[in-house]
């Protein structure tokens, strides 16, 4: 997608979108590579250490069988198919079959509880669901309240014998490996991904098939001109998150690059390093939360034979401390990128094209018009704080919030999609993130973003993780409060509170240091690894 270029400005001037009128994700990422050559698509490692390899030929045949089974069960174009599985071959097969059928995939996190599942299944009116026995245990009590959910496919030998439940392998064995994919337009719906729900009920972001093409420039830029030097791509991010699905799995397969799948019941930094070394991972997307946990692993480059060529990170601000650690521990410069479920991968760093600026996310990815605007959607001059926004139309931009026209209207101001984040842009095009609209702290007339304070706290040897919020104060409107998870061997006493306050005060500014500090065992996180600051403010 990105043309060859030796610098960012050259790349920007030469880029042009090439989105065909007719386009299908399943055909693009699977069928075009299934030529009988046995080209490797997926390496799957189970929790027990068993490893299997899946080719594009395998994927085509099995996804065709599943598409035929779905059609036999009455699924049609536009119907929603929920996918409630962790990383693995069947998850990918379900996505491919849904796209080829012209249906709409609805990925769901395996960590979701009953309420989260029921809301999404009811809101999307999913007609079919693909899961395993553990997943179906959560679904079974809900089915009476989900009249649209007609058919459940269950993977594994322990699939329950229940009405409306089909055993996945048995159903597929009865079908033909030949299937004629739906002739979809690039603008036809393909995918609903629900937002994290950090500011209210989750909203279903409906994406068209073109969303994959819209992601490619950002993936290629954040991954050092991907697929250059790419042999194997991995992320711990669940494929139910836009970061796992559209930052890794589908873009990698668009380029014919194999992907590594491995489910972690609980992410472990040591195990992550061992996994990457064992399989020779060259490219990785590692969210900041994963990087913070990996930072606790001693001397990884000395202990593991890493083959990394590129690492990208996004979802939360990275910070200078993690960036510096990455250069030493991973042997690469971590490229930070920015986006959201509705409009992803629109800003990025790329060490191959330009040096990152401290505190900046990066520059607009070619093809995406990013600006800082006011509440009316009018672009603001460099250096003026405002709302980070993306001009429409844009191939990566969502179509609408599923059955929520009011929320869709509120997402835009004039020609711009409002991300809900505040920031600034400088004359060189670098965008700096200040915070979510509702995360910015107002204290004694100052507007304070939590990111730099959290980054500063992480440089203290006692701190493993930190989150900063504003809490009401009668004199200052708000004061800065930090919630801190300590590294082993440190005690959260008054002396450490004072040490951390001095640590921030002497490195940032007097008005930015945390006047209150609470030591906690863990931080509240969304299923995608983002800090839920609202929960901390309410604590």
Residue positions per predicted region:
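Conserved ATP/PPi-binding loop(s) of AMP-dependent carboxylate-activating enzymes
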Residues: 364-367, 378-410, 448
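Conserved structural elements of the adenylate-forming
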Residues: 63-65, 173, 205-226, 291-295
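Conserved AMP-binding/adenylation subdomain of ANL enzymes
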Residues: 213-235, 240-282, 297
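Conserved pre-ATP/AMP-binding loop-to-beta segment of ANL
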Residues: 38-40, 154, 172-194, 201, ...
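AMP-binding/adenylate-forming catalytic core of the ANL superfamily
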Residues: 115-119, 127-132, 284, 392-394, ...
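Conserved AMP-binding A3 loop
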Residues: 52-57, 190-217
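Gly/Ser/Thr-rich phosphate-binding loop
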Residues: 254, 281-286, 295-356, 369
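Structural core segment of the AMP-binding/adenylate-forming
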Residues: 72, 93-96, 100-170, 280, ...
């Amino acid at each position: 997608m990105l043309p060859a270029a030796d610098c960012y400005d050259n790349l920007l001037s030469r880029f042009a979108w090439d989105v065909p009128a007719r386009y299908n994700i399943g055909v693009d990422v699977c069928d075009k590579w299934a030529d009988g050559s046995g080209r490797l698509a997926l390496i799957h490692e189970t929790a027990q250490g068993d490893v299997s390899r899946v080719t594009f030929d395998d994927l085509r045949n099995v996804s065709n069988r599943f598409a035929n089974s779905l059609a036999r069960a009455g699924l049609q174009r536009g119907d929603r198919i929920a996918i409630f599985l962790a990383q693995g071959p069947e998850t990918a097969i379900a996505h491919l079959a849904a796209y080829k059928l012209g249906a709409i995939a609805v990925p769901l996190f395996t960590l979701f509880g009953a309420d989260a599942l029921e809301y999404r299944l009811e809101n999307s009116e999913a007609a079919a669901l693909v899961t395993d026995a553990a997943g179906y245990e959560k679904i079974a009590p809900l089915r009476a309240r989900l009249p649209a959910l007609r058919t459940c496919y269950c993977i594994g030998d322990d699939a329950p014998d229940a009405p409306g439940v089909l055993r996945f392998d048995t159903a597929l064995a009865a079908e033909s490996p030949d299937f004629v994919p739906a002739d979809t337009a690039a603008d036809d719906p393909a995918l609903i991904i629900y937002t994290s729900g950090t500011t209210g009920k989750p909203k279903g972001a409906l994406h068209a098939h073109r969303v994959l093409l819209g992601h490619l420039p950002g993936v290629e830029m954040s991954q050092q001109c991907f697929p250059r030097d790419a042999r194997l791509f991995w992320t711990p991010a669940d494929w139910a998150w836009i970061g796992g699905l559209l930052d890794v799995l589908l873009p990698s397969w668009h380029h014919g690059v194999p992907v590594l799948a491995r489910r972690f019941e609980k992410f472990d930094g040591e195990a992550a390093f061992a996994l990457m070394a064992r399989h020779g991972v060259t490219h990785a997307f590692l969210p900041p939360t994963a990087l913070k946990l990996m930072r606790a692993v001693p001397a990884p480059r000395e202990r593991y034979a890493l083959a990394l060529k590129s690492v990208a990170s996004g979802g939360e601000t990275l910070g200078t401390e993690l960036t510096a650690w990455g250069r030493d521990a991973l042997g690469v410069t971590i490229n930070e990128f920015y986006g959201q479920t509705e409009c992803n991968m629109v800003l990025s760093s790329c060490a191959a094209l330009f040096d990152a600026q401290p505190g900046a996310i990066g520059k607009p990815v070619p093809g995406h018009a990013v600006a800082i605007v006011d509440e009316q959607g009018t672009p603001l001059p460099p250096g003026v704080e405002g709302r980070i926004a993306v001009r429409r139309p844009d191939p990566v931009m969502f179509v609408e919030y599923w059955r929520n026209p009011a929320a869709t209207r509120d997402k835009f101001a004039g020609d711009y999609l409002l991300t809900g984040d505040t920031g600034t842009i400088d004359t060189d095009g670098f965008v700096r993130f200040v915070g979510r609209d509702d995360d910015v702290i107002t204290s004694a007339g100052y507007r304070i973003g939590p990111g730099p304070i959290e980054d500063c706290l992480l440089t203290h040897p006692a701190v493993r993780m930190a989150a900063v919020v504003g809490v009401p104060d009668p004199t200052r409107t708000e004061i800065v409060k930090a919630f801190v998870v300590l590294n082993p061997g440190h005690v959260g006493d008054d002396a450490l509170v004072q040490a951390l306050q001095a640590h921030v005060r002497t490195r940032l500014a007097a008005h930015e240091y945390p006047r209150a500090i609470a030591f906690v065992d863990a931080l509240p996180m969304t299923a995608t690894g983002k800090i839920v600051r609202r929960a901390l403010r309410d604590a």
